[in-house]
Amino acid sequence: MEDKEGLDAAALAGRILLQNGAEIFRVEETIERIAKSYGMEGNSSFVLSSGIFITEEKDDKHFYANVKHIPLSTAHLDKVAAVNQLSREIETGKYTPAEAIEVLHNIQNMPEKSKTAQIIASGVGSACFGYLFGGSIFDSFAAFFVGSLLWVFLGIMSKRKKRTTKIMLNIGGGLFLTTLSILVYRLGIGDNLNHIIIGSIIPLVPGVAFTNAIRDIANEDYISGIVRLVDALLIAFCVALGVGIIMTVYHRIAV
């Protein structure tokens, strides 16, 4: 029974890591650490970007297995850090398997940052990158406004009763931010439309996903790396498509 609980704890830790943006090698390493800490020396794990497969060979007649399907999702690095810290504490013998599972459930249910904090962070990130790429103070102010409203728009779209696909959400985000950037620019708030758009687009850029894809490929986890890379490139394409549609229409009308 304790072996099964230990395997469940390792699987749950791996699931939380994979769901929240951890690299494949980190997931496998954490699973192995936790399993061995609970005396499961015969454990073997196989991790993909969308699934975890763990087995434990107790003896010739007894095997334990745990399979988890993990859909692609957004990153929550606080949860990744919490699981990493927990795995270190498990190695020191601080938790029994049952206690570790309870802590992992608490980590899994860890609340996100408040909506207000997320909106402000989106605006500040947009403003900073707008300025970093050569925009003026007024461009940064405009990017802050657009970036903040973009996050509100994304929150509304993602909470609709009818589920919005990732493709449509990112195309819609590109359409929204570009339309709002043009409106703000035409009202005379910013100096350069391109810099406003560049700053405002930052909340949609899949930076963590792209970085993890490259790291997975560098660590020879080719299947997971390619899947994550395709996902990141698809997001980038959808955002660019949304921006491009509005800019094309705007320039045709302006001319």
Where do the model's predicted regions map?
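Interfacial loop-to-helix junctions that mark the boundaries of transmembrane helices
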Residues: 68-71, 133-139, 192-196, 254-255
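C-terminal ends of transmembrane helices
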Residues: 106-107, 150-163, 211-224
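Core alpha-helical transmembrane segments of integral membrane proteins
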Residues: 112-187
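Generic detector of multi-pass transmembrane helix bundles and their immediately adjacent loops
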Residues: 185-255
